[in-house]
Regions:
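CheY-like receiver
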Residues: 133-182
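C-terminal output helix
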Residues: 119-128, 132, 136, 140
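Short hydrophobic/Thr-rich beta-strand motif most characteristic of the beta2 strand and flanking loop
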Residues: 35-43, 50
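Conserved acidic segment of CheY-like receiver
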Residues: 9-22, 26-30, 60
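Alpha4 helix (beta4-alpha4-beta5 surface) of REC/receiver domains from two-component response regulators
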Residues: 73, 97-113
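Conserved phosphotransfer microenvironments
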Residues: 54-87
Length: 182
C-alpha cells in the first residue's frame, strides 16, 4: 500500500534557541523540507507567548539549555496543562551538554525526543517523521506526563497510558480538525 508523503502546509513550528545563527540555519533546512510556518524564539518567555496562541504550534524544537535550563520547567508545565493550549504538543529538545544528570532531567520533563548537538537537518526531520508515524503512548501521572519510555516487561496492562492527540500527525497525513485540540 502506497502512502502519501506528509503535507506540511498547515504545520506550525516554534524554533527556540538563544543563538540566532542556529535558529536561522535550522529554519532554512526545515523550509527546504517543506515546513514553512516557523516562528522563532530566543527565550522561554517568547516560547510561552507562542504556546498561548489561539491553536498554538504543532512542534516545539528547542535548545534545552535555553534560559539556563528553564525550558525544562516550562515543558513540564506544558505537559501538566498549566500553560499553553495543547499539553500533548510534540517537543524535540536539543542539547550541547549531554551529561547524564542533565539528560535525565530533560527526558523527565516530558519531551518526545532529545537530539545531541550539533544538530543536522536529517536528524530533525527523522524525529519529525517519527512523531508523525510512531509517536508512543503517553504516561499520565501526577509527577510525569510524557512519552512512555518503559520497557514492556509488565504485561499488556499499563495503567495511565493514553494515546496523545497529535496535531502534527493530523495536519501531515490525516484530516485536520482544530476542534479536536481545543
Amino acid at each position: 500500500m502506497l502512502t502519501s508523503p506528509p503535507k506540511f502546509d498547515d504545520v506550525q513550528i516554534v524554533l527556540a534557541d538563544p543563538r540566532a545563527h542556529v535558529r536561522s540555519a535550522l529554519k532554512v533546512a526545515l523550509t527546504h523540507a517543506g515546513l514553512y510556518n516557523i516562528s522563532q524564539a530566543n527565550s522561554t518567555a517568547a516560547v510561552r507567548d507562542n504556546l498561548e496562541q489561539s491553536v498554538g504550534p504543532d512542534i516545539l524544537i528547542c535548545d534545552m539549555g535555553l534560559d539556563d535550563g528553564e525550558i525544562c520547567k516550562m515543558v513540564s508545565d506544558l505537559r501538566h496543562h498549566n500553560i499553553g493550549r495543547n499539553p500533548f504538543l510534540c517537543v524535540i529538545g536539543m542539547t550541547w551538554q549531554p551529561e547524564a544528570h542533565q539528560v535525565t532531567q530533560m527526558l523527565d520533563c516530558g519531551i518526545d525526543h532529545l537530539i545531541l548537538a550539533p544538530v543536522s537537518p536529517q536528524k530533525v526531520m527523522a524525529r519529525i517523521t517519527s512523531l508523525i508515524h510512531n509517536r508512543p503512548e503517553f504516561v499520565v501521572t501526577a509527577d510525569y506526563v510524557g512519552p512512555d519510555r518503559r520497557m514492556r516487561t509488565r504485561g499488556d496492562l499499563e495503567p495511565g497510558l493514553v494515546e496523545a492527540p497529535n496535531s502534527l500527525r493530523s495536519k501531515a497525513i490525516e484530516s485536520w480538525n482544530h476542534r479536536q485540540f481545543e
